Amino acid sequence: LRERGAVEISTVANEKVEDGSFSLPGYDIVVWFVGDESSANIVFSPAEKAAITSYLNGGGKLLVSGSEIAYNLGRTGAAAIDLPFFNNYLKATYVNDGSSSYTPATGQAGSPFEGLTLPFGVVYPEDFPDAIAPTGGATTVLNYAVLPNQGGIAYTGTFGSGILPGAVIYLGFPLETAAAQGMSL
């Protein structure tokens, strides 16, 4: 970002994406914070999933973080429509519902996050981070303190019917719970 000079940042409530009044295409990157949210076992509405799917199919780049995403979309008993979105667009599989002992997350050797230590659950408590595993060409970028559990995956390539390469970084914990003073490289 520093090399790009001026950076324009916009924020919008997910409900605006859901009702169609805000469109994701045209943005270089979308950062989607889910936090601890899972209302009635719904993390992404059908309209939100459709918007994200279209954005990634068109070569979009998505950073998404949250502790209930994998639990909601990827566990046994998840809605049949959720698993293909989770596997094919977030490029992950659900491993387990973790605990607060999973912090900090550390960068996977050989990944762009190598050497990073990222304590989470600091700004607000995070008691159930999702352990996830990469699928569909994704790779692990962050590991939890309780190994072999993984907390971050990344993928670059095409999605679905798309012909333009896009990218996703998916974190199984709320990134916004990390305190800057606890991060180290």
Where are the model-predicted features located?
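A glycine-centered loop/beta-turn motif at secondary-structure junctions
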Residues: 26, 30, 57-65, 121-185
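Extended interaction regions within the primary functional domain
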Residues: 1-5, 78-83, 119, 123, ...
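Alpha-helical scaffolding within the catalytic cores
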Residues: 14-22, 44-51, 148-157
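Short, solvent-exposed polar/charged micro-motifs at secondary-structure junctions
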Residues: 19-24, 104-115, 148-154, 181
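A glycine-rich, often tryptophan-bearing local segment used as a flexible ligand/cofactor-contacting loop or short
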Residues: 37-122, 134-138, 146
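Aromatic-Pro/Gly-enriched surface loop or interdomain linker
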Residues: 1-36, 161-162, 177-181
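Structural alpha-beta junctions
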Residues: 2-11, 54-61, 167
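Short linear motifs in intrinsically disordered/low-complexity regions
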Residues: 15, 20, 88, 97-98, ...
